[in-house]
Amino acid sequence: MRAVVVLLLVAVASAKVYDRCELARALKASGMDGYAGNSLPNWVCLSKWESSYNTQATNRNTDGSTDYGIFQINSRYWCDDGRTPGAKNVCGIRCSQLLTADLTVAIRCAKRVVLDPNGIGAWVAWRLHCQNQDLRSYVAGCGV
């Protein structure tokens, strides 16, 4: 029982809900501004609508896959959660690695996703809320 409590505390301690500007600065420092032709405001907008900037966000899909982390990266194609039938794991990671405050793995995988033919359009929330919009407000006042 004590081990379970310790594991839960570790999981909670590693979770993070980013502030908009804090995320913008972290993404910029990781080379996301302009990556594969996508401006920083696009990445911040995508993160807002996919996860509300929450690294612990998960969403189960009707096909049995799950979306994980701040970018809601899908277990059918990009990561291994050990329960999605026929998963491809193109990023070569465990989905649980996408649920931490450290964005390194999530950013590396998002950079891989955006190189596919759908580009940033692979994210439904980006298509619905960010595409062809004025996104300046997502980085306004952030000093980036």
From Swiss-Prot:
Gene3D superfamilies assigned: 1.10.530.10
- Localized where? Secreted
Q: Per its UniProt record, what CDD domains does this chain match?
A: LYZ_C
Catalytic residues at: 50, 67
Entries under SUPFAM superfamilies matching the protein = Lysozyme-like
Thermal effects: Optimum temperature is 33-49 degrees Celsius. Retains 25% of its maximal activity after heating 10 minutes at 80 degrees Celsius.
- Which residues are connected by disulfide bridges in this protein? 21-142, 45-130, 79-95, 91-109
What exactly does this protein do? Lysozymes have primarily a bacteriolytic function; those in tissues and body fluids are associated with the monocyte-macrophage system and enhance the activity of immunoagents. Has antibacterial activity against the Gram positive bacterium P.citreus. Has no antibacterial activity against the Gram negative bacteria E.coli and Y.ruckeri. Does not have hemolytic activity against trout erythrocytes.
Domain C-type lysozyme: start-end pairs: 16-144
Q: Name one Pfam family in it.
A: Lys
* Name of the protein: Lysozyme C II
Keyword terms: Antibiotic, Antimicrobial, Bacteriolytic enzyme, Disulfide bond, Glycosidase, Hydrolase, Secreted, Signal
Reaction equations catalysed: Hydrolysis of (1->4)-beta-linkages between N-acetylmuramic acid and N-acetyl-D-glucosamine residues in a peptidoglycan and between N-acetyl-D-glucosamine residues in chitodextrins
| UniProt similarity note | Belongs to the glycosyl hydrolase 22 family.
This entry's Gene Ontology molecular function terms read: lysozyme activity
Q: Which InterPro entries match?
A: Glyco_hydro_22, Glyco_hydro_22_CS, Glyco_hydro_22_lys, Lysozyme-like_dom_sf
- Enzyme Commission code: 3.2.1.17
Q: Which PROSITE patterns match?
A: GLYCOSYL_HYDROL_F22_1, GLYCOSYL_HYDROL_F22_2
Example of a GO biological process term: killing of cells of another organism
